[in-house]
Amino acid sequence: MDPAVASLGILALTTASAIIGQTIEDVETNIGSQSNPNSQVQLAPQMGNLHRFFNKAIAGEPFAYCTFCGVSGAITVATLYLHLPAVIALAIGAAITTLIWLAYSTTAYLGRVSGSATFNQPVFLDMLTENLGPIAGHAFIVFFCMTGVAYLMTLPVKGFAHPFPIPVIGMIWGMTIGAIGSAVGDVYYGAEAEFVHKKFGGGIPVASHGDITRKGVLGARSPMEVGNFTVKYGSPITGMAFGLIVLSITRGVYNIE
């Protein structure tokens, strides 16, 4: 195959994986309230507003995804040494990392929410069981895509062959998607999804802090409703932002024309 064609193909696949991974990352962190607006979720019980949100924000998005994308990359490299196909190795790395992510999410939710017991905030076990599945599914896609991007960047093809190992590249991109998720997607989540009962465009005055939207279409609002809200606009825009960054960096650094 012509090296130029191979480089363009890898560039397209890398960009597509970046867009998908970042989009799903924003949805996952919105479902788990692991983002900047989680402070409003944490503050709500203190203001007398009990809720049914899943809150696992004991670590911000950048550091959490930096760590776990690095773990996924390390497991993938270890699996590649077994001479398994790259797709299988990526899937195994993402799957094992997702199991660790579930343990992290469970302990984070129980610890974070039980810390509000002083303000009579209960721990809803159904929120734990109902949301772990979507969190795991979204997290698997993120780890698979980000580790895939790191793997593609190390292929011995003209314009790529990055000198850094896969785990290090995964950590760099993990921190990047966490930062972009906080900077782009969280604006839509925190300023709109959590305050839909407030006047649109009016900002969030200090007096409204903690007064989050707790009622959904039917009964109490659930984390999945937040995910459904943000996936319509905020998450795709976040994915496009990261995809364009990866595309521009890859073309600029490796001179792919």
Swiss-Prot record:
Membrane topology: Multi-pass membrane protein
GO molecular function, one term: tetrahydromethanopterin S-methyltransferase activity
GO annotation, biological process: methanogenesis, from carbon dioxide; methylation; one-carbon metabolic process
GO CC terms: cytoplasm; plasma membrane; vesicle membrane
Pathway membership: One-carbon metabolism; methanogenesis from CO(2); methyl-coenzyme M from 5,10-methylene-5,6,7,8-tetrahydromethanopterin: step 2/2
UniProt entry keywords in alphabetical sequence: Cell membrane, Membrane, Methanogenesis, Methyltransferase, One-carbon metabolism, Transferase, Translocase, Transmembrane, Transmembrane helix
InterPro entries reported for this sequence: MeTrfase_E
This protein's record includes keyword Methyltransferase: yes
Main localization category: membrane
Similarity comment text for this entry: Belongs to the MtrE family.
Subunit structure and binding partners: The complex is composed of 8 subunits; MtrA, MtrB, MtrC, MtrD, MtrE, MtrF, MtrG and MtrH.
NCBIfam families documented for this protein: mtrE
Function according to Swiss-Prot or TrEMBL: Part of a complex that catalyzes the formation of methyl-coenzyme M and tetrahydromethanopterin from coenzyme M and methyl-tetrahydromethanopterin. This is an energy-conserving, sodium-ion translocating step.
Protein name: Tetrahydromethanopterin S-methyltransferase subunit E
Organism: Methanothermus fervidus
Gene assigned in the entry: mtrE
